[in-house]
Amino acid sequence: MGIEQKYDVAIVGGGLAGLGLAIQCARMGYRTVLFEKESYPFHKVCGEYVSLESWNFLQDLGLPLSDMQLPIINRLLITTPNGNYLETPLPLGGFGISRYTLDQQLAAIARQEGVTILEETKVTNVIYRNNSFLVFSGKGETEARVVAGAYGKRGNLDVKWKRQFTQVKPNKLNHYVAVKYHIRTHHAADLIALHNFENGYCGISQIEENKYCLCYLTTAANLRNSRNDISIMEKDILMKNPFLERIFSNAEWLYEEPLAISRISFNKKSQVENHVLMIGDTAGLITPLCGNGMSMALHSSKLAFEEIHSFLQGTSNRFEMEIQYTQQWEKYFGRRLQAGRWLQRFFGNTRSSNLLIKTVKPFPKFVSFLIQQTHGKPF
């Protein structure tokens, strides 16, 4: 196969960060191509809670959020494995929407704006030479002036490029599995709950059509010790928490099988690799208990776009674009990720989660402060 049309921007991965960047680039008249290995619409392992800091940005992208009758979530419940709990208002709050709906709608907007979306297309390599890129995929070779990596938590390119987080031996920050269901259950629409269990925690909140997203994170060891059987693990470990026992016993399950992903790493990642700008989870993964991953993905697409735009306009060179993007990313997200890693130490353990709740319960302002450390302001 020969080289395809030359693009200004090529984006590897069509999640929130990739689609957000694609729409912004196409609107400025840049020829934009996006590679997505799946086909829209599709389900993804994700907590499906979006911080309200993203509301205006999503509306600006063309998503009619105000007309979608989505649940607005402004309360948080945290429970310990033995049933102690803390309920608190969320300082900014969020809303619930499934990735199935959100990604599909953003992909439709991207197409309307003129983005070339190549679905069911896996990128096998990206090579930089002579101030340009060659993107190798099942569709042949594509040339682009700028490439962004938006392929999620862990991809084949990470391994190919030997990114540092893939070279680290299994440890407390890099050996997790996540499992997601959609369910129907009795649960307040304005409440997101985080239920702790031994070596993990489970989030539940409402999405569109009165459905609920139930998504949990746990260690690979927990699954291994349950004969690698998710249902055994849920019965023997998760359901020891009385809140989870009630949900698992009474919910209507809307999936035949759960969605699951493994080898999740919270280790630090680089924001630029081989001159490719990394956005969303590809640049750094915040612990899910923060409820900020989707907003960070969208915000990082905005930061990346600003630097790409300067570069394509000729007001900055490639080196300046890469340095500026890395600095902006660190400025907005560095502390947030650190706070998330620190907070996660108190989760997934009976003693430490009880200690956290007992310590902070009398100080609602401090609870509010802790939550704010893991979130940003509207962008």
Model regions and ranges:
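Glycine-rich FAD pyrophosphate-binding loop
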Residues: A26-C46
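Conserved N-terminal glycine-rich FAD pyrophosphate-binding loop of Rossmann-like flavoproteins
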Residues: S39-Q59
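A conserved beta-strand/loop capping segment in the N-terminal third of enzymes
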Residues: S54-Q105
